[in-house]
């Protein structure tokens, strides 16, 4: 045994050998192992008469001997093994070469290939007819936004939809929702990737890895998208699925000698049969024995690898034709490879045709998501991998469950063919087997609970149970496999294309996935009752009854109808297939721009019926995923949309829902609207009722509120975890169905939409609990679970548990959204399931949640219940200022919620580290009608926060409210809620940023929101449902306050520091109203529409034009944000959108005509239009006051728009973003001009606008901020004034906090900021925010697109790749000139607020960094000018 002292002595001996005397002395004195030596050490450092060796050998000798030994061990053994292997390999290769070299062999091979192909086709037809087991799976990788990070494998739950009319082809429909961590964009793009375009192509791809001909088959099945996908796909998930298939096949082959023999025969036939020459026969004689043994056994590779494609195909065909291999083919779904070929062929030939039930776009289908086209290329390749991997698993499952596969009806296919031409290649057509007409397998990454994607909306209850049984089994295997993969993929709540299940059995279930060119255009139109696909332009209002949600927003929205049927089978029970009708309007901005009218809102509202899929949501939960920006805009439209959600939910719930769970309970009251913002922040929305009472939960829930915690979809294990919980839950009774409106969006406008949607729903008579969530786009992995307690529509001020009469029913009524973190999720989901009925389950996996279930309040209209739930993973991250009563943070623990006493506790943001028990009065400031603003769990909203969601709960009245332990904070929402404002945290820089409220209502400081877009959007979401066009118009002060972020003002008053209060005004819902309010408001509203953000209107009406423009800009930026995430990362894009929104709003405020022009431009997203609008702004006499600012804004917007537009052109929805940016820039410019003369550079303008936002908003706060946004306009105004001054410094801090990299970015930009700082300090915060956002966006865009360290380079490349129109160049030149002109003014501003400017520049860079179609070069030019 070697002791430490032995080592020390050896070292000492070495030192003495080297005569290192001083080192020896030091070593002896310091070494604890030589203490005894120290007593006898001489001055020279030597120990006399001491043998410093081990076994007579010193250190050098020992080491030399050791090295010699090791070299002997390692060197001798390798050559023998390697040489033998190499010899065998050489031998087999030489044989193959000689064989292939013979011309006769080649000729015969071709003939064999032709005949074999023909034979294979015949056999496939027969097999498909005889074996419906080969399920059609279409791989639809879902690319979320950009792939800022190599997307975790998009979870693909591929469930055989049923065979296509061509029985021979089995397609796997795999919807991959991959999302980058930060670029989680909801349903940004759906890629339909052929499993294998051609057998040969697959063979070539797979040949290197083929082990057997069966494995070849498998491989071929995977290979088509496989090769491209592998780059992006999570290697583990893909490997797992592929390995499963290969292992199964391998086991079968190894266990069956006859199969091995036949395989060898088939191989030898082709290797030998063509060799008629003497040499060839000799070789062939060897081949059967040697090649097979040498290659297959030693190398584990089939000899075919070295054969030509034709030879491989021949062998494969021969094998397939052999009935003995039928089981193997079933394993791999041998038809899959054929189907893949057919799919690619049929898709290419008939993208819209019905015969391929699926229309596959090119593997580059990602082009579908136009706004993220740059990302599309990355995402596409990544997605196909998902498809392939899922295909493998699915084929196995499908084959195993062959009885489940039904032949898809031609009708369905035909219906699919209806998909719009623009979507043709991008359209995902899935015909469900007639039996399962409504059954669809969708991987809905954003909704972990929906993760099973055994979402078969069986239009018929009959079909549902039956299909549920059939598919449950398949799903059990498939889901498990797919879930394994799904959990890897990060997907926003973009639902994969899922088939809509026509309510009528007659109508084949057609899932329409329209992928618009625009980033937000990706439309998943799943029409349930109406099999027809609604055109993107068609508005929901027009077709309220039709499931195809808002077609107008379809471009911007992904419409997803996922039907999970109650778990009839054990697997299905796991999945608890919930019929989920999810219309996800990813591009909230696009939606806003598209649906400036209520139609937008309608389209935004997505009906989602979630029946304990993933969650043990025992009952159907109709979740409308949508930004529902304008949901309240038009009562009729809203009613239509509500009706759609409501009616479709009911009809589909009842019809599509498993017969077990009729959706009768899913009535308007019961419908749950889950609005997932354009950002994929809420990638996964898992509705997990307590497992114990899954059915009961849903049942009691519908009338009552549901508490759901929503986590990001990123937690990969969550899917699997969710599944088990769903397994626990039993079928969901129709009575168990709970209807909630869950709005998950990073965009502030979405939050406004929630209010609008609630108002609309109330108008429609659809009192649905509304949950407004900000999706955690920035740190999807960190995404805190958003816990939402939804009070029932009619229960006013009643907590969810209070609403539920029975404790058991309450437990049942609780829907817990699992947080995406898989590990925490699982435990908490189970725990959440265990939640007692008395407690609204606040399930926080990563962090505390704030579950605020506001009581219905008149402010919100009929849909009174608004729940804002926030999950803060790292409460400590919150600043101490957040610790004020304003912010309530529910500390989250990995431990089950039931076990934890913490969930009941409300912990103020970590800074204060104070914990409020839910029972205790959280804050004297909280009033029953309190507004709760939840910042998104994006990247640290506050500097100290990491992926936490600051939640500020502000009560207008200041009444204390206590929440019973374990209950979510029950915040009765009154008008103050509508006036959502995040109280300014005592730490203005951080908490304010976290709030994302930059005095938003009056001070369009939504740059913060941009940074925190997801969180801000939550704040914005803070139930502006009440705000309706009419309400906004009539009660500018009041409802604008309410709908816009007035509450911050009022709420802020109760808050500790009014100056810190930043009001988040999301006027998207109020855009029309704002127009009515006044020209400025009209402009703002128009801009809002353009930006697809209605919030600006509210902002403008609430505050004077100067203040309003910044708010509008911020809002618009937030609105733009959803498109940007598609382009970049969600959060980044959200930021840029917010900035652009603000700019746009300010521009809009400049003049109504300009607004109209800008809105038009936004719609067109043409730089020329933007230039025209800018010119008009300059020309318009109305702009005389703000002309300079407007011009600056116009220039900025032009430049931004130009950059954005180029980006937009690349990414379908960019155009909206560009317009938004330009408008926001204009707004900021207007503000700037108020303070100073017009500046020309867009970047300068943007910076100035940002500064303007901060300073102008402050000024406006002092003057306009008191605007009636908040019901208590007077107090709000005073508070606003305070916040203006205070916000100046904090805003930059907030911005830095808001942007994940804001802090870092600020210092680099400081030199640039002075030159481009706005004329007044008012814009300093905005400028900082803009700069920070821009930098973040650029960096994230670069990361997501190319994962390279040079985001600008990547963006530049992308921009260059996209054709730059000469008009854009001209516009850029004009903008540059203008920017130069504005330089002096910006410099003046910089003198006043350089620090703010730095931050602003950073933010500015982020939002303007290629928000959508922005040219990198142009963008850089503008930045340089600003610098």
UniProtKB/Swiss-Prot annotation:
Modified residues (Phosphothreonine): 1270, 1350
Bias type Basic residues, positions: 1396-1406
In-chain residues carrying the UniProt-annotated modification Phosphoserine: 207, 554, 599, 775, 779, 1100, 1151, 1200, 1254
Subcellular location: Nucleus; Nucleus, Cajal body
InterPro entries xrefs: LisH, NPAT_C, NPAT_LisH
Biased amino acid composition, Basic and acidic residues: 1140-1151, 1276-1285, 1371-1382
Principal cellular location given in the protein's record: nucleus
Effect caused by changing residue 1270 to A: Impairs activation of histone gene transcription
Modified how: Phosphorylated at Ser-775, Ser-779, Ser-1100, Thr-1270 and Thr-1350 by CCNE1/CDK2 at G1-S transition and until prophase, which promotes association with histone gene clusters and stimulates activation of histone transcription. Also phosphorylated by CCNA1/CDK2 in vitro.
Domain LisH: 3-35
Pfam families membership: NPAT_C
Record region (Interaction with MIZF): 1-318
Coiled coil location: none
Region annotation (Required for acceleration of G1 phase) ranges: 629-653, 828-853, 1039-1054, 1228-1252, 1325-1349
Effect on the protein upon substituting residue 779 to A: Impairs activation of histone gene transcription
Lineage: superkingdom: Eukaryota
Outcome when changing residue 1100 to A: Impairs activation of histone gene transcription
Name of the protein in its database record: Protein NPAT
Gene source species: Homo sapiens
């Amino acid at each position: 045994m070697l002791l430490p002292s032995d080592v020390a002595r050896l070292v000492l001996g070495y030192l003495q050998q080297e005569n290192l005397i001083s080192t020896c002395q030091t070593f002896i004195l310091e070494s604890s192992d030589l203490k005894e030596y120290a007593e006898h050490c001489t001055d020279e450092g030597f120990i006399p008469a001491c043998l410093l060796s081990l076994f007579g050998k010193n250190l050098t000798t020992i080491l030399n001997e050791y090295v010699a030994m090791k070299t002997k061990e390692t060197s001798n053994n390798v050559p023998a093994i390697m040489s033998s292997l190499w010899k065998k390999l050489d031998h087999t290769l030489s044989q193959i070469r000689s064989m292939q070299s013979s011309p006769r062999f080649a000729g015969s091979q071709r003939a064999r290939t032709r005949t074999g192909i023909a034979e294979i086709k015949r056999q496939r037809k027969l097999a498909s007819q005889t074996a419906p087991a080969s399920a059609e799976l279409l791989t639809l990788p879902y690319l979320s936004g950009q792939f800022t990070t190599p997307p975790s494998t998009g979870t693909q739950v591929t469930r055989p939809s049923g065979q296509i009319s061509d029985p021979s082809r089995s397609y796997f429909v795999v919807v991959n929702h991959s999302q980058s961590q930060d670029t989680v964009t909801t349903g940004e793009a759906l890629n339909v990737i052929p499993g294998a375009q051609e057998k040969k192509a697959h063979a070539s791809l797979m040949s290197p890895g083929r082990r057997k001909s069966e494995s070849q088959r498998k491989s071929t099945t995977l290979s088509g998208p496989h090769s491209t996908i592998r780059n992006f796909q999570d290697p583990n998930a893909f490997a797992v699925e592929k390995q499963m298939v290969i292992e199964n096949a391998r086991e079968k082959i190894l266990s069956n000698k006859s199969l091995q023999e036949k395989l060898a025969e088939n191989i030898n036939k082709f290797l030998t049969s063509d060799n008629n020459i003497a040499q060839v026969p000799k070789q062939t004689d060897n081949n059967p024995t040697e090649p097979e043994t040498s290659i297959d056994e030693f190398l584990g590779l089939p000899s075919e690898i070295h054969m030509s494609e034709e030879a491989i195909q021949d062998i494969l065909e021969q094998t397939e034709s052999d009935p003995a291999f039928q089981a193997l083919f079933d394993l791999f779904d041998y038809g899959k490879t054929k189907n893949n070929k057919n799919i690619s062929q049929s898709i290419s030939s008939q993208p819209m045709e019905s015969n391929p039930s699926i229309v596959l776009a090119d593997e580059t289908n990602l082009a579908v998501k136009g706004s993220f086209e740059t990302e599309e290329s990355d995402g596409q390749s990544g997605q196909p991998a998902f498809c392939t991997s899922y295909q493998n698993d699915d084929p196995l499952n499908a084959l195993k469950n062959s009885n489940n596969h039904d032949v898809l009806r031609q009708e369905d296919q035909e219906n699919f063919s209806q998909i719009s031409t623009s979507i043709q290649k991008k359209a995902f057509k899935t015909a469900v087997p007639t039996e399962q007409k409504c059954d669809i397998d969708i991987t809905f990454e954003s909704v972990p609970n929906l993760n099973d994607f055994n979402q078969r909306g069986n239009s018929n209850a009959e079909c549902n149970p039956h299909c549920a049984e059939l598919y449950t089994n398949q799903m059990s295997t498939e889901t498990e496999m797919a879930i394994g993969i799904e959990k890897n993929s990060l997907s926003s709540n973009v639902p994969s294309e899922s088939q809509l299940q026509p309510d009528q059995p007659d109508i084949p279930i057609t899932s329409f996935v329209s992928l618009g060119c625009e980033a937000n255009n990706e439309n998943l139109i799943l029409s349930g009752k109406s099999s027809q696909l609604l055109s993107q332009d068609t508005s929901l209002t027009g077709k309220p009854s039709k499931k195809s949600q808002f077609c107008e927003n379809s471009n911007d929205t992904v419409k997803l109808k996922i039907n999970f049927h109650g778990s009839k089978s054990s697997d299905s029970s796991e999945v608890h297939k919930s019929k989920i009708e999810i219309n996800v309007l990813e591009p909230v901005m696009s939606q806003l721009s598209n649906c400036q009218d209520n139609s937008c809102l309608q389209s935004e509202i997505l009906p989602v019926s979630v029946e304990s899929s993933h969650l043990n949501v025992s009952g159907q939960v109709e979740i409308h995923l949508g930004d529902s920006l304008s949901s309240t805009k038009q009562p009729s439209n809203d009613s239509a949309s509500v009706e759609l959600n409501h009616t479709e939910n009911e009809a589909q719930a009842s019809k599509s829902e498993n017969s077990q769970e009729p959706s009768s309970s899913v009535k308007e009251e019961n419908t749950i609207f889950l609005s997932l913002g354009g950002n994929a922040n809420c990638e996964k929305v898992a509705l997990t009722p307590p497992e114990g009472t899954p059915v009961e939960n849903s049942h009691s829930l519908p009338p009552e509120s549901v508490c759901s915690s929503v986590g990001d979809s990123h937690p990969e294990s969550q899917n699997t975890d969710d599944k088990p919980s769903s397994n626990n839950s039993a079928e969901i009774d129709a009575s168990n169905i709970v209807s909630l409106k869950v709005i998950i969006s990073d965009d502030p406008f979405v939050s406004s939409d929630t209010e609008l949607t609630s108002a609309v729903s109330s108008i429609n008579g659809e009192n649905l609990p509304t949950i407004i969530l900000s999706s955690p786009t920035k740190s999807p992995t960190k995404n805190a679970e958003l816990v939402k307690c939804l009070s029932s529509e009619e229960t006013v001020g009643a907590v969810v548990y209070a609403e539920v009469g029975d404790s058991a029913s309450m437990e049942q009524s609780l829907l817990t959204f699992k947080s995406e973190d898989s590990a925490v999720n699982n435990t908490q989901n189970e725990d959440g399931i265990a939640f007692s009925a008395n407690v609204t389950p606040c399930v926080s996996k990563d962090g505390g949640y704030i579950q605020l279930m506001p009581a219905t309040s008149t402010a919100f209209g009929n849909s009174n219940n608004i729940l804002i739930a926030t999950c803060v993973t790292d409460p400590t991250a919150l600043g101490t200022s957040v610790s004020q009563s304003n912010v309530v943070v529910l500390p989250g623990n990995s431990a089950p919620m039931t076990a934890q006493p913490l969930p009941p506790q409300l912990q103020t943001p970590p800074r204060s580290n104070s914990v409020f028990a839910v029972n205790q009065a959280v804050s004297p400031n909280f009033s029953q009608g309190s507004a709760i603003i939840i910042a998104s769990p994006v990247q640290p909203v506050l500097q100290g926060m990491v992926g936490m969601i600051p939640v500020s709960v502000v009560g207008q009245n200041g009444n204390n409210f206590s929440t019973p332990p374990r209950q979510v904070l029950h915040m009765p929402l009154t008008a103050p809620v509508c006036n959502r404002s995040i109280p300014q945290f005592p730490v203005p820089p951080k908490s304010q940023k976290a709030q994302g409220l930059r005095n938003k209502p009056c001070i369009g400081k939504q740059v913060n929101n941009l940074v925190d877009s997801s969180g801000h959007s939550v704040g914005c979401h803070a139930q502006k449902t009440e705000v309706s066009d009419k309400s906004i118009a009539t009660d500018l002060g009041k409802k604008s306050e309410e709908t816009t972020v007035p509450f911050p003002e009022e709420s802020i008053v109760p808050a500790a520091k009014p100056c810190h209060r930043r009001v988040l005004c999301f006027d998207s819902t109020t855009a029309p109203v704002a127009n009515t309010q006044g020209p400025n408001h009209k402009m703002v509203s128009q801009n809002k529409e353009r930006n697809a953000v209605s919030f600006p209107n509210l902002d403008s009406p609430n505050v004077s034009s100067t203040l309003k423009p910044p708010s509008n800009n911020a809002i618009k930026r937030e609105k733009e944000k959803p498109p940007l995430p598609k382009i970049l990362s969600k959060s980044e894009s959200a930021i840029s959108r917010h900035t652009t929104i603000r700019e746009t709003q300010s521009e809009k405020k400049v003049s109504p005509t300009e607004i109209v022009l800008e809105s038009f431009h936004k719609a067109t997203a043409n730089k020329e239009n933007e230039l025209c609008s800018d010119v008009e702004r300059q020309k318009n006499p109305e702009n005389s006051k703000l002309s300079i600012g407007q011009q600056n804004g116009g220039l900025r917007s032009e430049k931004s728009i130009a950059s954005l537009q180029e980006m937009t052109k690349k990414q379908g929805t960019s155009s909206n973003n560009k317009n938004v940016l330009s408008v926001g820039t204009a707004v900021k410019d207007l503000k700037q001009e108020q303070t100073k003369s017009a500046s020309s550079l867009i970047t300068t303008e943007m910076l100035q606008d940002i500064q303007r936002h901060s300073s102008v908003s402050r000024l406006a706060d002092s003057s306009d901020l008191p605007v009636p946004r908040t019901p208590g306009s007077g107090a709000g105004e005073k508070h606003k004034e305070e916040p203006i001054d205070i916000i100046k410094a904090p805003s930059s801090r907030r911005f830095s906090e808001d942007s994940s990299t804001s802090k870092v970015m600020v210092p680099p930009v400081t030199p640039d900021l002075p030159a481009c700082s706005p004329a007044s300090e008012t814009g300093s915060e905005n400028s900082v925010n803009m700069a920070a956002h821009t930098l973040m966006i650029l960096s994230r865009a670069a990361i997501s697109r190319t994962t390279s360290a040079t985001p600008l380079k990547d963006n530049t490349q992308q921009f260059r790749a996209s054709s730059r129109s000469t008009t854009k160049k001209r516009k850029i030149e004009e903008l540059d000139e203008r920017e130069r002109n504005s330089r002096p003014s910006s410099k003046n501003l910089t003198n006043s607020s350089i620090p703010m400017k730095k931050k602003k520049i950073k933010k500015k860079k982020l939002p303007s960094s290629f928000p959508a179609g922005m040219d990198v070069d142009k963008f850089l030019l503008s930045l340089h000018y600003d610098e």
